[in-house]
């Protein structure tokens, strides 16, 4: 499959996938929703949030977007935590967008990062930050080539002035796990083309 470049806002701010999302979410259990989603996968577009690629592999990176996308799934978190996820994400200054996944069983959030060439280190720091809220994020999100499937959520959250999440450690050095939770958020952005 040959991909094409699109504006992120055209992917996020649309109701084109409302019908598919509602069909998937009407299934009774998470397993049924997952299986049904697999049958519809050819109808659901997906993009790489973290960069533009000529081939979808790390060495095919043309330019990083400066954004990291994290997934928060029901299988990794308790129902009590999942109920709190939307309000927690909305409270974080570095979350610029969050919404339900297409199955409705999880959430994803888009976070601007200070150094897009060090996505993995930012992921590890954000993973520690989320643990402080009791949230486990999907480990596969540290992959810069990770796909994000389109979704529909009429209660999505958008903050065009989100700050960048960045590390206080020297990211030219290997990241020590003990330092991975040392972060700050700053660099307020209002550029709507970013999202």
Residue ranges and their predicted role:
Residues 58-63, 90, 98-103:
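Short glycine/proline-enriched loop/turn "hinge" motifs that connect secondary-structure elements
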Residues 105-111:
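A generic structural motif
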Residues 77-94:
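Short amphipathic alpha-helix segments
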Residues 1, 54-77, 113-195:
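DNA replication initiation modules
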Residues 24, 28-37, 89-93, 126-134:
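Hydrophobic, Leu/Ile/Phe/Ala-enriched alpha-helical segments that form helix-helix packing faces
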Residues 97-103, 138-143:
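Short beta-strand
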Residues 68-71, 97-100, 108:
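Structural recognition of the beta-strand scaffold that forms the well-ordered cores
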Residues 1-66, 76, 178-181:
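DNA replication initiation on ssDNA origins
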């Amino acid at each position: 499959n040959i991909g094409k470049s699109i504006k992120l806002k055209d992917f996020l701010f649309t109701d084109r996938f409302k019908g598919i999302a509602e069909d998937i979410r009407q299934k009774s259990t998470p397993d049924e929703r997952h299986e049904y989603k697999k049958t519809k996968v050819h109808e659901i577009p997906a993009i790489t949030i973290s960069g533009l690629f000529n081939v979808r592999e790390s060495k095919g990176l043309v330019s990083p977007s400066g954004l990291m996308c994290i997934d928060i799934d029901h299988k990794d978190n308790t129902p009590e935590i999942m109920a709190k996820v939307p309000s927690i994400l909305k409270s974080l200054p570095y979350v610029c967008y969050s919404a339900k996944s297409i199955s409705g069983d999880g959430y994803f959030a888009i976070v601007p990062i200070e150094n897009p060439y060090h996505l993995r280190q930012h992921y590890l720091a954000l993973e520690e930050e989320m643990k402080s809220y009791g949230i486990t994020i999907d480990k596969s999100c540290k992959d810069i080539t990770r796909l994000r499937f389109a979704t529909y959520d009429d209660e999505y959250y958008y903050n065009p002035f989100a700050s960048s999440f960045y590390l206080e450690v020297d990211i030219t050095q290997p990241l020590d796990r003990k330092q991975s939770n040392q972060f700050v958020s700053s660099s307020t952005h209002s550029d709507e083309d970013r999202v």
